[in-house]
Regions:
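Conserved N-terminal phosphate-binding loop of PLP-dependent enzymes in the Aspartate aminotransferase
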Residues: 1-383
Length: 383
């Protein structure tokens, strides 16, 4: 049996930093998963862990879900990729349009990064404007345009962006404070912003909730100034409710991005909106999007079965009940400490050293060293 340390020492020789994504890096080294089932991960040393990260988002229905596995096996018998349209991708698109608010047509892609990148291109093409507004701490994938004051792995590494991004790539990206409508309005009212892209709940800087009425004000500001609102539901979609944060907060985007959960553990994402908007995507329109694996039949099979399970009446009450049970327990244990705990169905975050977090600036003031210690101790206890 090889140890986690042995595998990490070898992986550093062949993989950048020993991992394929920086958020998987841990000190002194990560554990290497051998298999998973339900809520549990089992590493190569035989240690088991409860996966509260849900595979960083996709595994809402648990690892090795038997229904999804069966659906995938059935598709594998028919083929893995064709390079042609399939009837199943029509069914998948139709199902999404029936579930997701304000979506009539979609384009399937493979990752959340591809979805947000394509959504921004579409907004620019429609408005004939270049500028994009995002929010401090909001993470919309690993493409140049949005790696500005981002959350996720960028938040916990050395800098808030990345080397290798030309200044010209981000000169039209403006990042403003979340939950501050005046900061947003002062930029958008200039009339030259193509799109506002927003995580309705900023999940990659913890779990920063929008204040009451804030998202409606964001929508109003966008509409009044001819700016499209991109609702990035890659994380919140199908998590906080079947209709995502749009349904929860009663605010619809013009373009909606989806990912993570919709693939049931397989690479699958999408962006969508009203027909008037989506008809601008190639080949009908002049905004280009393409991909060899777009609508991959194996991913679509997993996605369709995932939607079947999510639409069952017991699914979301169960998710909310589990979230409440976990967060109630955390609150009981930390109520006498200086902490802030925020949650929505299927997601939560505990901040140390602060009592309120309403934006990225507040999140950065939290005691991240204490959080690292907390995380390390949880790993020792199999969490």
């Amino acid at each position: 049996m090889r140890s986690n340390k042995d595998l990490f020492d070898e992986s550093k020789k062949y993989l950048c930093g020993g991992v394929n994504s920086p958020v998987r890096a841990m000190k002194p080294y990560p554990f290497f998963t051998e298999r998973a089932k339900g809520p549990m991960l089992l590493d190569v040393e035989g240690n088991s862990y409860i996966d509260y990260c849900l595979g960083y988002g996709p595994m809402m229905l648990g690892h090795k879900n038997p229904e999804i596995i069966d659906a995938v096996k059935h598709q594998l018998e028919k083929g893995t990729d064709y390079g042609t349209p399939t009837e199943e991708e029509i069914t998948f698109a139709k199902r999404l349009s029936q579930i997701v608010p304000n979506v009539e047509k979609i384009r399937c892609v493979n990752t959340g990064t591809e979805a947000t990148m394509s959504a921004i291109r579409l907004a620019r093409g429609i408005t004939q404007r270049d500028k994009i507004v995002k929010f401090d701490g909001g993470f919309h994938g690993a493409h140049d345009v949005v790696l500005v004051k981002a959350g996720s792995g960028v938040m916990t590494t050395a800098s808030p962006g990345s080397m290798g991004i030309p200044k010209d790539s981000i000169k039209n990206t403006i990042s403003v404070q979340f939950n501050n409508i005046e900061a947003l309005s002062s930029i958008v009212e200039k009339g030259n912003v193509a799109a506002i892209i927003i995580e309705p709940i900023i999940a990659n800087a913890g779990c920063i909730l929008p204040e009451k009425g804030y998202l409606k004000e964001v929508k109003r500001t966008a509409k009044q100034n001819g700016t499209l609102l991109i609702m990035d539901e890659v994380i919140t979609g199908f998590r906080v409710g079947l209709g995502g944060a749009q349904e929860c907060f009663k605010v619809n985007g013009d373009i909606i991005t989806m990912g993570k959960i919709i693939g049931g553990g397989f690479p699958l994402a999408a962006f969508g909106g009203k027909k008037k908007i989506m008809n601008e995507v190639s080949p009908e329109g002049h905004v280009y999007n393409a991909g060899t694996f777009n609508g991959n039949p194996v991913s679509i099979a997993a996605g369709l079965k995932t939607l079947d399970i999510l639409e069952r009446k017991e699914t979301y009450p169960k998710i909310k009940n589990m979230t409440d049970k976990i967060t109630d327990g955390i609150y009981d244990m930390t109520s006498k400490m200086k902490t802030a705990l925020y949650s929505a169905p299927g997601m939560f975050c505990l901040y140390f050293g602060v009592e309120k977090v309403k934006n990225y600036q507040d999140a950065k003031k939290s005691d991240t060293e204490m959080f690292k210690k907390f995380h390390k101790e949880l790993l020792k206890k199999g969490v």
